[in-house]
């Protein structure tokens, strides 16, 4: 293992939950306002996820005041305080870019139900 890989592996976060495209998540982001720092929640559907080691990222989409808002988060960023999975979505695609063109009830995603044994 070379030096660059070793440094990247030290910076990877292991406290993040497992989530996939279609899941509704709440991301707590650290926001600096002057000298203060506070947490801001961003809740939406994961429409894309890119797994590239330290360069991993995911895109979250939500509807705010009738307008679609998308935000790309770096998975291992220090600006992300926590991620909470609110509900699991049942989808067949890895990238849900088709949701950009849908509004209202057409943009809903079915919930994946856990089967107890």
From Swiss-Prot:
InterPro entries documented for this protein: Ribosomal_bL19 (IPR001857), Ribosomal_bL19_sf (IPR038657), Translation_prot_SH3-like_sf (IPR008991)
NCBIfam families per UniProt: rplS_bact (TIGR01024)
Cystine crosslinks: none
One annotated GO biological process: translation
PANTHER family in the record: LARGE RIBOSOMAL SUBUNIT PROTEIN BL19M, RIBOSOMAL PROTEIN L19
Signal peptide as annotated in the record: none
HAMAP family: Ribosomal_bL19
Record function comment: This protein is located at the 30S-50S ribosomal subunit interface and may play a role in the structure and function of the aminoacyl-tRNA binding site.
Record's GO cellular component terms: cytosolic large ribosomal subunit
Record flagged with keyword Chloroplast: no
A GO MF term: structural constituent of ribosome
One Pfam family from the record: Ribosomal_L19
Family: Belongs to the bacterial ribosomal protein bL19 family.
Keywords of the record: Ribonucleoprotein, Ribosomal protein
Protein name from the UniProt record: Large ribosomal subunit protein bL19
Gene name per UniProt: rplS
């Amino acid at each position: 293992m070379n030096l660059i890989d070793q440094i990247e592996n030290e910076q990877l976060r292991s406290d993040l939950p497992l989530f996939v495209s279609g899941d509704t998540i709440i991301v707590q982001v650290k926001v600096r306002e002057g000298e203060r720092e506070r947490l801001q929640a961003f809740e939406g559907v994961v429409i894309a996820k890119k797994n590239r080691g330290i360069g991993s990222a995911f895109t979250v989409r939500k509807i705010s005041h009738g307008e679609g808002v998308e935000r790309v988060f770096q998975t291992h960023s220090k600006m992300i305080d926590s991620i909470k999975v609110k509900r699991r979505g049942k989808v067949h695609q890895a990238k849900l870019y088709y949701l950009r063109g849908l509004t209202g009830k057409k943009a809903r995603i079915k919930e994946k139900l856990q089967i107890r044994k």
